[in-house]
Amino acid sequence: MTKRIFLPFLVLFLLPSLVSAQVAITGKITGVVVDSSGASVANATVTVKSPALMSARTISTGGDGAYLFDLLPPGTYEVTITAPGFEAFAETGVVLTAGFTATVNGKLSVGAVTQTVHVEGEPVVDLQTAQTSTTFDQTLLQDIPSGRDPWSTVAQMPGVTSSTFDVAGDNSYQQSAMQVHGSTQAEQIYSYNGLDLNWPGANGGYTQFYTNHDSFDEFQVVADNAPAAVPIGGVYMNMVTKSGSNEWHGQGAVYYLTAGTQAGVKFPTYNGGPVTSGSPFDQTMDASASLGGPIMKDRWWIFGSYRRYDLRQEILSVTDQAGNPVVDVNHQTNTDLRSDFQVNPKNKFSFIWMYNEQNRFFRRDTAYAFVTADASWLQIEPAYILEGLWTSQVTNNLLLDFRVGYNQIRFPLGYQPGVTSTTLNVQDVANSTETGAAPYAFANPAWVLKWTAGGSWYKADWAGTHNFQFGLEWGKSFNGYNYNVNQGIDVLLNGGNAYQVLAYNTPTTQKNYFRDTSFFLQDAWNIKRRLTLNLGVRYDNFRTYYPVQSSNAGETFPDLFPITTYPASGNLVDWNNVSPRLGVAYDPTGSGKSVIRAAFGIYYIMQGTGLAETANPVGLFGKYYSWTDTNDDGIPQESEWLPQGAATNPVSEFGGSSTHINTNMSRPYSEEVGAGYQRQIWNDLSIGVTYYYRTKKNLIGIENSAVQKSDYVPVTGFTNPITNAPLTLYSFQPSDTTLYGKFNYTVTNIGLLDDNSYNGVEFTAVKRLSHKWQVLGGFTIQRQKGVYGRGFSDQATSDNFTDPNLDINRNDNYLNLDSTYVFKVDSTYELPWKIGTSVNFQHYTGYPLQPTETFEVPNGQTPSPVDVGESVILQPAGVQRLPSVNMLNLRLSREFAIYEKWRLIPTVDFFNVTNAQTVIGEVTTFGGSYLFPYSTINPFVARFGLRLAF
């Protein structure tokens, strides 16, 4: 494994001729140089310099006077233009963010070169790209009150909806599922310096790496109309880490709150009485320190950062047997190191190492109300990321960029330190208690290896100017699941009396892999200076599989679970897909202050090892056996629950795979259309309006191919309790009686699910920081409707499309995290005497509810029909909704200059200022607890901070 890890880093230095693809972590500066008559000035010398650059870069204009600088790191730039016989031209204050193209046109006047015309300006409208993205710069990252994690940061972006609502970081220890403008829920990429390094399991849209908020220079989110370099059409988080500079700079910060700075919990009511709900703070402490600077000025920069974050919350709805709420203790540490070395003016190397531990000390099984500390899991979760980056300016117009990254992951749920190998897990189903030890020990080892290489080539005088970008990306990912159970059994009691024994096939190990390869080509073709066509195409190959696997020879009960070897699966899917990415940007006035954009693209929905996991025959199996405690010692001997040895019949069992993959199915994708207008209306303020449309195709679900829908017959006599209307259900009555109990589940494309659409209009206002204030705001009106599939992330793998009972009220549902009106505002403003203020406000229409009920429907078996539980949708999602959510967070700060460049900034943050403890979760299963409120937003809390920067 060591050789596999470090070989790509060796290749990084030995193969500079490779070219390939990745997402922009840099920006561009482009423009046209003309004389006073408007004629192009060829061969003018254009130079850019910035504190973000180790050395200035210089190019010459083409025959049409055009020029382009690509692969510029985020920062503030000065652009200087000189030409013989003309006065020099210089524009300062040009701010670049990741993915932004700044247009700086130079108009030269006849005169001496020694004379310079200075212009101070900051382009805020990107005239050449069609993508929709939001960049959180240092001011937004540091000065907006938030949970200081990726999910509470993305939640500030216009149009985004999330599965959680953050109050001062109360959800920062557990990641959220996000979507934007109808994207697939949890279709999320966590990109570090342009390398996609997600956790590879399930649908591939999650992370195991919890970040250091203060280590980022920028946090860019690409959402819609993305170019061919971006693989998905969901939430693409492009996190750019800080680097050193030619001057030493650093920061130390601490943020603190306790239960004493928090308002009291207001319980929701149900049937006239209060409901215990909420997870208020006990205490949080978030401390970080960072330092960066030069080892050799203009040659070698270094940066380092450390964070320790402790979070303690009371889980009010879960108590011990004495009635005290349990305390959830969480601990996070991060260490981040970066080194940048400028080998020569045209070649730069960077090395990045990030380490994270995300620890939860008492993670409890949610199946029981009372779980003792010794029966909880200990989660000590280490992860690290290694990255190597190389940028080379081959010529003035050709740049190459190579990156390689490795992500090592291990997510464990282990036994507590005091639990020995002979300690048994004891569950009392009547008293809802769990004691002794956790039900099992679990580990999820995983790794991701990615390398990419990309090129940018600029060509003028081809019916306009062209910026070609091209690239190749290759990756291999592994995801495993390991289980072990003390003595191979759990003990089940019923009211303190012997009841059952649950025997497992442990220890067991499951292995899953996927490989992905991509290539893209993109051209930004600028025609007559005002029109830019973005023409892109992307190719993706995805393969997932599991290797040859065997049961563990050390199984506790090999007689119950025979040792078996399973052959390799081969490629369960081998998808080869081509997707167009087409966009247009037009400057209607030629002033550089407004742009009309339109785009169309196909985006293939991301995948992880989920398909391989679904079909993998190796996993956790269990069998329940009746237990008679004949010697009354409370300890199950084998003779008491296996009186006939392996011939003893279990009461029930689980595990084993009866699910298969249709290897010929097509990869799911979405089609996106966007059109909008953006205009700079004052200084650094721009406003815009954009229409978004999206539909998804080739979505997947499960069918039971062992039977047909025609094997079900309609039956009456049922009533819909929501509408009180008669309800027709369907009884399984096949003419072939051997089909009873037959299951052959197949994951395949479900054409019915193609009936879906998203329509939205979004109004935005963005002002970069200048004149002491800044704004990021958006108002979104949207609707996402279609056919509902049981499952998650638009994969209906918990459904059965052969069962007509599950089709009842399946159509015309509001889907996923649909919210009709979403309004967001982030803003900072500096009052006199260096008093800083900031606001973070978010409004969401409540998410849709979907009522269901399980009916017992007798089948046609003779002589005694068997009742089959059928979970039926009583009403399409969205007819009823959760309450709307309004969240207002404020900050006050005061900056003190204490020594030259040293600044001391005390802060106080006020979260959920209105103390709106809104219900955000209700039981949707009809019955005695229908619409029972089980989750609410946490109460108002104040957090105090102190930041020292230089």
Question: Language-model features: where?
Answer:
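Transmembrane beta-barrel wall of Gram-negative outer-membrane proteins
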Residues: 249, 279-360, 378-404, 580
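Periplasmic N-terminal accessory/gating domains of Gram-negative outer-membrane beta-barrel systems
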Residues: 62, 86-243, 260-262, 270-276, ...
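Periplasm-facing N-terminal accessory domains of Gram-negative outer-membrane beta-barrel systems
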Residues: 2-129, 137
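C-terminal beta-signal and adjacent terminal beta-strands/loops
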Residues: 684, 697-698, 702, 783, ...
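Signature of Gram-negative outer-membrane beta-barrel scaffolds
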Residues: 322-326, 438, 465-591, 793-797, ...
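Gram-negative outer-membrane beta-barrel transporters
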Residues: 688-848
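Solvent-exposed loop/turn elements at secondary-structure boundaries
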Residues: 163, 549-579, 583-751, 803, ...
